[in-house]
């Protein structure tokens, strides 16, 4: 990393948690990732979900076909775990270089997770095979019981699922995705080299007051939901600490404006256009710019056993205005920090 007055040069980053959707939406949103990020772990929660090698190969090709000319971008594909998925399918996908990782959604925990897992113990044969092969398990870490408060679901997931899982599969490589609580940050920080976590820009910049005070702000609504300020501060401390177990994962999750601004709005923040600038802002505020490159560009590849990118990207302390909306077909998307002026600009 090179730091000059008002500029910062870092290895080109990767996004270790990304939703690209499909069809017209894919073509609308992909350029905002590929212009800043060299690789991204692409989530499999399409309708229907990506549960076979053939589906995954076809989806990967649709992504590659949508990459703008002049952009160098590699999608890293994932398999959607279900109660019925076989060990043979998962391991075949890994051997063929199709599945980089497997994604565990508890059933009905978030967008397009109805086909998700209903029994964690039922997946133990998959976890054993993944532990032996070194394949990472990516987890949306929330319990879904109706009697558990939505703000408590991540902390309860640690107690009910993560602790037994780590006990039973101590060398299974696990990414606790988009962590949102002090408990999760502490759990990962105290773990070993087989445990890591991604953190989103919205959970670093905002807490539930920002979403709910003065009216409901639907474009900050995501799952796991924003928590109290004490959790936000714990996440900021974790992300900027320099610990290698924490790395960038935007969880950029686009929805058309009409589906966000509705009586039953969808969960997800479309942050790809502004994520890198947002992370830089947080690290600057925490006086930790010296750790930004590791968080964005080094820790993730190291955990996945991949080389860091050789290309570089430059961030400059220059004001950048965020547009209010982005076209997607005949409708629009609202980007994270829409209408605001950012402190940082990216020179790709």
From Swiss-Prot:
Binding site residues for substrate: 19-21, 45, 140, 223, 255, 267
Protein's UniProt keywords contain Hydrolase: yes
Cofactor(s) needed: Zn(2+)
Catalytic EC class: hydrolase
Cofactor binding summary note: Binds 2 Zn(2+) ions per subunit.
Coiled-coil regions listed in the entry: none
Pathway in which this enzyme or protein is active: Pyrimidine metabolism; UMP biosynthesis via de novo pathway; (S)-dihydroorotate from bicarbonate: step 3/3
EC number: 3.5.2.3
A Gene Ontology molecular function term of the record: dihydroorotase activity
Catalytic activity line of the entry: (S)-dihydroorotate + H2O = N-carbamoyl-L-aspartate + H(+)
Binding site for Zn(2+) 2: 103, 140, 178
InterPro entries with a match to the protein in the record: Amidohydro-rel (IPR006680), DHOdimr (IPR004721), Dihydroorotase_CS (IPR002195), Metal_Hydrolase (IPR032466)
Active site per UniProt: 251
Pfam families referenced in this protein's UniProt entry, alphabetically: Amidohydro_1
Protein task: Catalyzes the reversible cyclization of carbamoyl aspartate to dihydroorotate.
Quaternary organization: Homodimer.
UniProt name for this protein: Dihydroorotase
């Amino acid at each position: 990393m090179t730091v000059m007055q008002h500029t910062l040069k870092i290895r080109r980053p990767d996004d270790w948690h990304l939703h690209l959707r499909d069809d017209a939406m894919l073509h609308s949103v992909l350029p905002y990732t590929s212009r800043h990020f060299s690789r991204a772990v692409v989530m499999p929660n399409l309708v229907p979900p990506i549960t076979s090698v053939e589906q995954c190969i076809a989806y990967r090709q649709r992504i590659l076909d949508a990459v703008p000319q002049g952009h160098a971008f590699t999608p890293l594909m994932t398999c959607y775990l279900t109660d019925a998925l076989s060990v043979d399918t998962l391991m075949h996908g890994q051997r063929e270089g199709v599945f980089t990782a497997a994604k565990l959604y508890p059933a009905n925990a978030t967008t397009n997770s109805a086909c998700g897992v209903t029994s964690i113990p039922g997946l133990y044969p998959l976890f054993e095979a993944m532990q032996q092969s070194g394949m990472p398990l990516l987890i949306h870490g929330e319990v879904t019981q109706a009697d558990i408060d939505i703000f408590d679901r991540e902390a309860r997931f640690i107690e009910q699922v993560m602790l037994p899982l780590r006990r039973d599969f101590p060398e299974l490589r696990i990414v606790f995705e988009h962590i949102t609580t002090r408990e999760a940050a502490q759990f990962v920080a105290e773990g070993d080299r087989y445990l890591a976590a991604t953190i989103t820009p919205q959970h670093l910049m905002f807490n539930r007051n920002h979403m709910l005070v003065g009216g409901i702000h639907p474009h900050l609504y995501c799952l796991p939901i924003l928590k109290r300020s004490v959790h936000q501060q714990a996440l900021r401390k974790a992300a900027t600490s320099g610990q290698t177990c924490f790395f960038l994962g935007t969880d950029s999750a686009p929805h058309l404006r009409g589906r966000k601004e509705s009586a039953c709005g969808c969960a997800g923040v479309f942050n790809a256009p502004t994520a890198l600038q947002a992370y830089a802002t947080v690290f600057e505020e925490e006086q930790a710019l010296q750790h930004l490159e590791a968080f964005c560009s080094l820790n993730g590849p190291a955990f996945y056993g991949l080389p860091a990118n050789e290309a570089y990207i430059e961030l400059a302390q220059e004001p950048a205005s965020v547009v209010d909306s982005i076209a997607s077909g005949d409708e629009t998307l609202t980007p994270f920090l829409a209408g605001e002026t950012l402190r940082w600009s990216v020179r790709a």
